[in-house]
Amino acid sequence: MTKFTEKATAITPNREIQPDEYFNETDHLIYCSKCNTPRQCRHELQGKVLIPSIRCKCQQEIFEQEEAQRKLHEKQMEIKHLKTSGLQDKALYDYTFSKDNGINPEIKLAHNYVSNWEEMKSNASGLLIWGDVGTGKSFFAGCIANALLEKGIPVLMTNFSRILNTLTGMHFEDRNQFINSLNRYSLLIIDDLGIERNSDFALEQVFNVIDSRYRSKKPLIITTNLTLSELNNAADIAHKRIYDRILERCIPVRINNRNIRQDNATANLKQAKKILLNNHAPNQN
């Protein structure tokens, strides 16, 4: 008998053998009865033989499955938290690529923006999505927001009316702190630029938000009913400095589509009319 075998034989397992285990007389280790792989290993350290417990093959498979489920749950909770924080209107949850009806050819640009996000982020490249009312600009931006949020990327989609309501009544320091907090998001999406009130205070705060984002070197997406000509030919200095900041970093994308909102409303009215005409009034007796 060798010296190594003598040591191994002299040392007994440091725990009881369970019903689903057996003791291997060859290497003196406990094995799993199901997969026939060891649940112990042998180490020699400073002349002493140590026999710690390890996972057998089937235990390792169960562990990996449970670990995958745990990570998936954590990821789902993270995404849920990001969406709660980043999508301030519940309707935005439905603005996803899977809900696209295929009538907007420009949607491929939204796909490309998401696919090339790391490069867009690195270059602080944003989008200026412009076009008539109801053509799907918010849906376009929302698809980008949801796709990135599903990847665990912090996105905030809001509008200046909401931002201005928050800033109104704040002290100067608090306003700056709030505006700076918007830069915690990897992508900031401002929906419907131009519908906010046009006071001096509003214009100043709109510029502060845009300028802060510009200086943070993080991408910004803007949607607006304003035309590119109106943005390039601002009526005054206050608007010009806002638009210049946007145009410097945001790639213009025109959504030249039918009025989807009007089409949907018309379809809903037709369906309601059909229901009214095809159904008899309930018996009131």
Q: What is the predicted role of each segment?
A:
Residues 192-193:
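Walker B catalytic acidic pair
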Residues 105-114, 124, 145-185, 197-204:
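Short glycine-rich substrate-engagement loop in P-loop NTPases that contacts/grips substrate
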Residues 127, 156, 189, 221, ...:
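Hydrophobic/aromatic beta-strand patches that form the interior of the parallel beta-sheet core
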Residues 87-91, 96-127:
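Pre-Walker A (pre-P-loop) alpha-helix and adjacent loop at the N terminus of AAA/AAA+ ATPase modules
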Residues 121-141:
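Walker A/P-loop nucleotide-binding motif
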Residues 1-101, 265-285:
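A short, basic N-terminal segment
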Residues 153-154, 184-187, 216-222:
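Loop/turn-to-beta-strand initiation segments
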